[in-house]
């Protein structure tokens, strides 16, 4: 059975935790393991933070869009902004690369996404925004609740 959720919110730093918790709550119906849930929450946090800090350069007028589709123990996430886009996607995907060193950003966001998810696709064009598509196959075993 397929189940979908769509979320739209202002590109404000304080909305990052809202996005993370909302996605985690929606995914909980598949009974993921704690590790799987933590990885997905971390990826959502990284992608949303990238949209706010880099995509909109903290311009509160922007919107962040999240779509989640659950189907047969697979989570499909799309996180999109309509910000400034990424001029050099290959460079941006390199570990430790950041365009905002003055903000003490680690430059590990895309690396974390690629390590925690089964598939990561990034589409971006300057002045057109960025769309990140992520796929995670959940284990069929049930989470243990003690």
UniProtKB/Swiss-Prot annotation:
Binds to sigma F and blocks its ability to form an RNA polymerase holoenzyme (E-sigma F). Phosphorylates SpoIIAA on a serine residue. This phosphorylation may enable SpoIIAA to act as an anti-anti-sigma factor that counteracts SpoIIAB and thus releases sigma F from inhibition. This is Anti-sigma F factor. InterPro entries: Anti-sigma-factor_SerPK, Anti-sigma_F, HATPase_C_sf. It comes from the Bacteria. Its EC number is 2.7.11.1. It catalyses: L-seryl-[protein] + ATP = O-phospho-L-seryl-[protein] + ADP + H(+); L-threonyl-[protein] + ATP = O-phospho-L-threonyl-[protein] + ADP + H(+). Belongs to the anti-sigma-factor family. SMART domains: HATPase_c. Pfam families: HATPase_c_2.
